[in-house]
From Swiss-Prot:
Residues 254-317 form the bZIP domain. Ubiquitinated, leading to its degradation by the proteasome. Phosphorylated at tyrosines. Residues 40-108, 177-219, 315-353 are annotated as: Disordered. There is a cross-link at K32 (Glycyl lysine isopeptide (Lys-Gly) (interchain with G-Cter in SUMO2)). It is found in: Nucleus. Residues 254-279 are annotated as: Basic motif. Forms homodimers or heterodimers. Monomers and dimers are able to bind DNA, but the off-rate is faster for monomers. Interacts with NEUROD1 and PDX1. May interact with MAFB, FOS, JUN and PCAF. Belongs to the bZIP family. Maf subfamily. The modification Phosphoserine is found at S14, S49, S61, S65. It comes from Homo sapiens. InterPro entries: bZIP (IPR004827), bZIP_Maf (IPR004826), bZIP_sf (IPR046347), Maf_TF_N (IPR013592), TF_DNA-bd_sf (IPR008917), Transcription_factor_Maf_fam (IPR024874). Expressed in the islets of Langerhans (at protein level). This is Transcription factor MafA. The lineage of its organism: Eukaryota, Metazoa, Chordata, Craniata, Vertebrata. It is linked to Insulinomatosis and diabetes mellitus: An autosomal dominant disorder characterized by the occurrence of multicentric insulinomas, hyperinsulinemic hypoglycemia, non insulin-dependent diabetes mellitus, and impaired glucose tolerance. Some patients also exhibit congenital cataract and/or congenital glaucoma.
Length: 353
């Protein structure tokens, strides 16, 4: 993994190389199909060996990467060092590209561009029928190996296994040389798919973050659903604190805030109901008082009429009694009988006088 990180750090920084890496697409290369005879011959070859005859097959030989630098002493005359005990092929046949440390040292100047050229040639010599893989499967295996190998290491062995299956048995060399070649190839592939891997990595972490947030939200929902609204309102503070032991502070604060909101809402509804009830009571009392006022007005009118009648009768009686009393005073009274004797005559004369 340290070799992979080292190769990823040695990527070219020139604008031309970066533009070439970004424009590189593996899907534009087609896979060459070999006849069944070549496939059977390929299966008869021992793993890890190289063919020294002109009848080389895709499983036994791969094209060498074009070199931008002078070959190092560790490289063969055919253009690449042999891997795992192999030698350079006769007649200028190219050797495997990742034979050993010498090959890596010989191409240390432009490792990314050389590996990209080698990958373009390697796609033409791969036999998909022997591996039962399609170009899409190969690209997916490379993408999965580049992303998970750089960020997760040994936690994803499936991607590494898919990458090994994509390489094929004829490409396998020595232990140390094969590891170095894999690191070199992975560095070039990481440069070719840097943008896609970064985008996939961003979505991967976003997915994990969303999953964690969803889990926390589910825990909060379970805590809030543990108590109904009626229980939260009717429960005492001491009982609620006893029930909330063992939960986080944020969850407790959220639940208490919900309880406070419910209590305030209930108090507001109670006040609103009381106001409405009092308004209805006052309106009914107002209607009763207004009806009583109308009845009192009618009673006042009736009493006023009765008063006027009694007053008129009194005036009539008073007017009739005044003239009768004045005429009665002028009526002659009856004379008293005359008295005998001289005193009687004198009294009568005094009476008339």
């Amino acid at each position: 993994m340290a070799a992979e990180l080292a190769m990823g750090a040695e990527l070219p920084s020139s604008p031309l190389a970066i533009e070439y890496v970004n424009d590189f697409d593996l899907m534009k290369f087609e896979v060459k199909k070999e006849p069944p005879e070549a496939e059977r011959f390929c299966h008869r070859l021992p793993p890890g060996s190289l063919s020294s005859t002109p009848l080389s097959t895709p499983c036994s030989s791969v094209p060498s990467s074009p070199s931008f630098c002078a070959p190092s002493p560790g490289t063969g005359g055919g253009g690449g060092a042999g891997g795992g005990g192999g030698s350079s092929q006769a007649g200028g046949a190219p050797g495997p590209p990742s034979g050993g440390p010498g090959a890596v040292g010989g191409t240390s100047g432009k490792p990314a561009l050389e590996d990209l050229y080698w990958m373009s040639g390697y796609q033409h010599h791969l036999n998909p029928e022997a591996l039962n893989l399609t170009p899409e499967d190969a690209v997916e295996a490379l993408i999965g190996s580049g992303h998970h190998g750089a960020h997760h290491g040994a936690h994803h062995p499936a991607a590494a296994a898919a990458y090994e299956a994509f390489r094929g048995p004829g490409f396998a060399g020595g232990g140390g040389a094969d590891d170095m070649g894999a690191g070199h190839h992975h560095g070039a592939h990481h440069a070719a798919h840097h943008h896609h891997a970064a985008h996939h990595h961003h979505h991967h972490h976003h997915h994990h973050g969303g999953a964690g947030h969803g889990g926390g939200a589910g825990h909060h929902v379970r805590l809030e659903e543990r108590f109904s609204d009626d229980q939260l309102v009717s429960m005492s503070v001491r009982e609620l604190n006893r029930q909330l032991r063992g939960f986080s502070k944020e969850e407790v604060i959220r639940l208490k805030q919900k309880r406070r909101t419910l209590k305030n809402r209930g108090y507001a509804q109670s006040c609103r109901f009381k106001r409405v009830q009092q308004r209805h009571i006052l309106e009914s009392e107002k209607c009763q008082l207004q009806s009583q006022v109308e009845q009192l007005k009618l009673e006042v009118g009736r009493l006023a009429k009765e008063r006027d009648l009694y007053k008129e009768k009194y005036e009539k009686l008073a007017g009739r009694g005044g003239p009768g009393s004045a005429g009665g005073a002028g009526f002659p009274r009856e004379p008293s009988p005359p008295q005998a004797g001289p005193g009687g005559a004198k009294g009568t004369a005094d009476f008339f006088l």
